[in-house]
Amino acid sequence: TVATSEGASYTGVINQSALTIQCTVPMTTQPSELEACSLTVSATMNTSVTVNGAAVTEETFDLNDPIVLPASYDGKTKDYTLTVVISNTEDDLAAGKQISADIRLGGIPQNVYDYSVAFFDGKFYAFTSGYTAADSAAYYQVFTSTNGTRWTEVNTPEIIGGMGARPVVFDNKLYVMGGVRAIGTDQDGNAPEIESNGWSSSLTLKTFRTWSTGNGSTWTDESIEGNSTLTDDMFKMLVGNGSFGFVGVTPFTFNDKLYMESGAMMAFGMFQGSNSQLWVKNDTTYTMETGASSFLRSHCSTFTLNDKIFILGGARGYVGATNLQTSVSNSTDGVTFQTVADSTKVGPICGATVVTNKEGNTAYLFGGLYYNEEGARVMNNNIYKSTDGIEWTVIEGINPQYTGTFSPYVVVDENNIAWVFGGFKTFSGNYTPYSLTVDEMDPSFAAWAFALN
């Protein structure tokens, strides 16, 4: 029996003639979960089983590669080769399988009200924002998991992240970008990054936070300080005067460059204006790609497919029935954009998340909201797929218990499984589901896995 580092147990099948033991584990198993497995061997007829001369119960093993188990009895020894195989098919994953109804039951604190998830180097990383009303305390933490359900905190010397911070993998490093700390006093005693003049509120944040890691444990501060006087550096100027969209930025990679759509900014005492600007990393700052400006919309879905950037849906201005968009635009160089479809079978939608399979040739759309015939906001429970970003089809046979959310976090692992975390269950505002009041936000903590086909 093989027990993984997360406590899951699987029984191997012995082939006596070939002297092999094969243990098949679920498709959702990550290689990182197999790095420290324990073994239980039930031997017969006083047979002893060892590894390198030691009893197997005394060791843990990296079972990403086969190991040899010598079995000795009455002076004779047979060498059995144990191989762990990650299944490449699982029927219930095609329809979707709920991995967790609430990831806070597996190590994420109960006070978390916002989080985002990345998949990096075989592990999941969650960047959380928590708040305890009793003492007005805020907590910004990093957690890691090998299976998406059991989470362990990553201890960092500095506070990383903030409400609306978003991760991206670029150049073999994991980045977490943006976010604000405007609710409560953080764990280092820093006051909220918000000020009020009696009739309106504004951010005091003058830094675009960016942290990176190459190993998941050692983090480097790559934050960019704003400067409102730099008229020749628009990014630093916007950051410096507090008018940049820090909350819910959309980072992505294209043509070996790091891009980012701005998130929601603070204006007139509220968050608004999501996805209004497209930026590309340029040394120690970002440069705006103005060619995308007329195609961007609030909460549009931006993704890369077949070596192109696509922009789908979104809302013109506030989120309303007449403002939702249906068109699709794309770009082959990240500079010049064009409309390639006025509408799709997805229909008017905003807040959907689109990812591609690891081959980069098929896109999948999750979540988002639309308006029904009665004019009510409805979360999209369908999952769509497309090979060209224009023609979309509904994937049939999806688990009826799956419910879509607004702006879910979707990551694709090496097994071509899409892991869907969180998002917002409802959207009651006009511009963004984010608020300066925790009780006004309605996050989901469910996690699902879907095999991409």
Protein language model regions, located:
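Kelch-like beta-propeller repeat domains
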Residues: 90-453
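Beta-rich interaction/scaffold domains
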Residues: 1-113, 453
